[in-house]
Amino acid sequence: MANSPSAKKRAKQAEKRRSHNASLRSMVRTYIKNVVKAIAAKDLELAKTAYTAAVPVIDRMADKGIIHKNKAARHKSRLNAHIKALGEAAAA
C-alpha cells in the first residue's frame, strides 16, 4: 500500500484511469460486436451502418492509447473485408 501522500494520490489516479479505460474498451468492443452481428445476419446495410459508426470510435480510442493503433487498423481492415465479401456474395 502507498505510504506517502503523492503515492496515495497516484494510486487513486491510476485506479480511476483504469476503470475509465475499461469502460472505453468495453464501448469499442460493443461497436465491433454490432458490426459482427450484422455480418453474421448477412444484413449488408446494417453492417455498413454499424461499421460507419464504429470506425471513428475505434480511431479515437487508438489516438487516446486505449487500444494500440495496429489493433485498431486490424479490426477496421478485417471488418471491412467481411463487409466487402458480404456485398460480393449478395451481388453474385
UniProtKB/Swiss-Prot annotation:
SUPFAM superfamilies, sorted: Ribosomal protein S20
Listed InterPro entries: Ribosomal_bS20 (IPR002583), Ribosomal_bS20_sf (IPR036510)
An example Gene Ontology CC term for this record: cytosol
Region (Disordered): 1-23
Residue ranges, compositional bias (Basic residues): 7-20
MF-aspect GO terms: small ribosomal subunit rRNA binding; structural constituent of ribosome
GO term, biological process aspect, one: translation
Keywords: Ribonucleoprotein, Ribosomal protein, RNA-binding, rRNA-binding
Stored Gene3D superfamilies: Ribosomal protein S20 (1.20.58.110)
Keyword Ribosomal protein: yes
Record bears the keyword RNA-binding: yes
NCBIfam families recorded: S20 (TIGR00029)
Family: Belongs to the bacterial ribosomal protein bS20 family.
Function of the protein: Binds directly to 16S ribosomal RNA.
Name recorded for this polypeptide: Small ribosomal subunit protein bS20
